[in-house]
């Protein structure tokens, strides 16, 4: 833990800090090292202790905890990532880049050589439509998928999940159902609400699980719109 405190002390004067739990990717060198028991991952209790140390550090040095894994000095929030969390459309340009236009998401192919070849062909022939399906893939987002993504991302931020926004953008019935779903989470002190759902300090430790509890499926959407 002392090493962690020293790491935080080193970055105390920068305006923005992102701290994410490490995701162990299969086939990576670290994965192999851990599989061979040359290193071990910290247990949950140790991770929670690190998080508490991080929060204390952030408060002491006037960082705003504006997203579960992100801290900033005033006016230094990440504009790039905030677009994801606030459901704003964005355009990705380049190999493997992702784009989002509210109703769909698309991602460009990841092979750089193929990407360049397709662009050359488009520039030569001037017919983008013939290459569209080869250059990127697209996923159409259903209303249930859209509201679930909003719940998942907004709950991670200090701005919270607004029931009025859900009622206006998706369906009043969605907002009514969501208000009913949170009662047990409120009793267990995971979430609080006055028309805006926000995670408590305790709830932040279980953000993904809580969001999943609040998700809607396609049948929910059909039922609310009958």
Predicted region positions:
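Short, amphipathic alpha-helical interaction segments positioned at domain boundaries
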Residues: 202-226
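Residue-level detector of family-conserved "landmark" positions at structurally sensitive sites
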Residues: 19, 68, 177, 194-195
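Long, highly charged amphipathic alpha-helices
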Residues: 53, 177-180, 209, 213
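C-terminal scaffold of the Radical SAM
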Residues: 1-172, 219-226
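Short amphipathic alpha-helical interaction segments
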Residues: 172-184
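A short, conserved structural fragment
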Residues: 186-195
